[in-house]
Amino acid sequence: MVMNTDYLDTLPEIKNRFKVDLQPEEKVVFTAKPWAFSTEKGDLLGADDARITMTNRNIIADNGNGIWVTDIAEDVVDMRKQESGKFLTKQVYILVTLNKEVTYGIGIQKLNGYQFHFHKKDMAVFEEIIRHMAY
């Protein structure tokens, strides 16, 4: 799947709530405080203090201890809503799949993507954005 990042350029700029550093021509199009974010396998990376910012170029995930910057055009191969579990164990999240393995921590831990566990309102907004991005 190819991500249509041109769509992000058409979105209005919103407030840079989490004061992320921006490059020239980069604008914030989405911000949220998820209830959690984790690796693609579910290993917790951040919880209540986590902050997610999407610009027209990058996804920036900050857990308060470290910042992951992912170039959407270069690094992301897929973004989609996923559901796992049933009833009380049901989880709904956005799965971001990367085109290469990334190491983190002290360099031994690896991930190939992220799970963003947004609150319902933020989930709907993010879903609408990624719906327009998939070719």
Report each predicted region and the residues it spans.
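Anionic N-terminal interaction surfaces
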Residues: 1-52, 135
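Acidic, Ser/Thr- and proline-rich intrinsically disordered linker/docking segments
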Residues: 3-4, 66-135
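Short, well-ordered turn and helix-capping elements at secondary-structure junctions
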Residues: 34-36, 58, 65, 83
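Short polybasic amphipathic segments
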Residues: 35, 59, 93-97
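Short aromatic-glycine motifs in intrinsically disordered, low-complexity regions
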Residues: 46, 58-69
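A generic structural signal for well-ordered coil/turn residues at beta-strand boundaries
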Residues: 48, 55, 90-92
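Structural motif
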Residues: 55-56, 73
